[in-house]
């Protein structure tokens, strides 16, 4: 399907928009809900990842296909490793079968899990034979995708003696680890995160909880970009958000000040308003703690004629697609001068915008 987008004469906008729940929070809570009775969740994400995870958790099939859903693949690997007596094959799309899983599999094997590869070593599909995991200490590199670490954390309190995870080296995406721990704490799971060590105490049963998932800050990034690219006075109101968010992408509030966007909170509504035209010529950001918003920031910078250097993006190359390569390809069509490495992006300022271009999405 092709959609043609045309400019408008009046570029000042005022809108109210309801955003669905955070995918990151939703997926973590769904695993915890399956492990503990009495957890009721509202405002779940309507993302494909969350739908795939919900289906997998309710399925009795021997082969579970999670499509492109990387979070589901990682979280379910630990979940099914814990299900004593259950054997499943976890698989996914062609792209998913080229996304590494070995670091997580090795950590689970170190704890006593039984997992094997059905095809290529280190990649899905994987065969998991659920068993009682009795070991309670494991090491894993800190600079890997935080989803590996969160996957282990989510099952940790169900182990007989809990779990101690030692993170080796520099830790990537700490906000996502803290998000996992915060949600666990809300459910009564005791955790301690000091220096490079995370300790989780065992818990047989959580207290009954009604949890409202905060709306997704990553989704909010697109509306930040729209406001930044619009006339002064443009305003978008988004629901429902928390001023003290546990989502790393809430850093948008401070980042988009560079683009002339002011953020205010009114109850659970966040108000984005274009207050000034940005006079920035260059923007340099380390997005190690929030890499998923890099693409939106790059597009905003390009639209405003601002050069930018974005660092800490190494996890984007192993997503559902190589996001850095895809961004470079599509922005170049529009006239951007952009270069990428394994962990960074550099965009030169440019006032030229090519028209009548087809963008792959």
Question: What are these regions, as identified by a protein language model?
Answer:
Residues 1-361:
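Short, structured segments at the rim of ligand-binding sites
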């Amino acid at each position: 399907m092709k959609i043609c987008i045309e400019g408008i004469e009046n570029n000042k906008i005022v809108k109210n928009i309801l955003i669905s729940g955070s995918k990151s929070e939703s997926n973590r809570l769904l695993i915890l809900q399956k492990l503990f009775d009495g957890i009721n969740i509202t405002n779940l994400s309507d993302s494909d990842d969350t739908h795939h995870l919900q289906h997998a958790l309710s399925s009795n099939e021997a082969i579970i296909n999670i499509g492109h859903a990387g979070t589901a693949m990682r979280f379910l690997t630990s979940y099914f490793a814990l299900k004593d007596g259950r054997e499943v094959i976890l698989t996914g799309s062609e792209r998913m079968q080229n996304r590494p899983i070995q670091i997580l599999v090795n950590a689970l094997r170190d704890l006593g899990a039984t997992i094997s590869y059905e095809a290529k070593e280190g990649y899905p599909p994987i065969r998991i034979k659920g068993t009682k995991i009795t070991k309670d200490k494991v090491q894993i590199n800190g600079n890997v995708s935080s989803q590996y670490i969160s996957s282990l954390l989510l099952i940790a309190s169900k182990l007989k003696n809990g779990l101690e995870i030692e993170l080796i080296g520099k830790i990537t995406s700490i906000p996502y680890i803290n998000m996992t721990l915060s949600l666990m704490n809300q459910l009564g799971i005791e955790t301690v995160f000091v220096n490079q060590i995370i300790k989780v105490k065992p818990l047989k049963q959580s207290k009954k909880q009604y949890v409202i998932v905060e709306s997704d800050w990553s989704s909010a990034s697109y509306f930040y970009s729209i406001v930044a690219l619009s006339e002064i006075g443009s305003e978008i109101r988004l629901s429902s958000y928390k001023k003290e968010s546990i989502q790393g992408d809430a850093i948008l509030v401070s980042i988009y000040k560079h683009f002339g966007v002011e953020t205010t909170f009114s109850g659970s509504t966040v108000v984005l308003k274009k207050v000034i035209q940005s006079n920035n010529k260059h923007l340099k950001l380390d997005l190690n703690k929030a890499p998923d918003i890099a693409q939106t920031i790059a597009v905003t910078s390009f639209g405003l004629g601002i050069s930018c250097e974005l660092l800490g993006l190494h996890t984007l190359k192993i997503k559902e697609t190589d996001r850095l390569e895809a961004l470079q390809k599509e922005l170049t069509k529009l006239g951007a001068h952009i270069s990428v490495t394994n962990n960074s992006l550099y965009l030169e300022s440019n006032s030229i915008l090519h028209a009548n271009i087809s963008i792959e999405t």
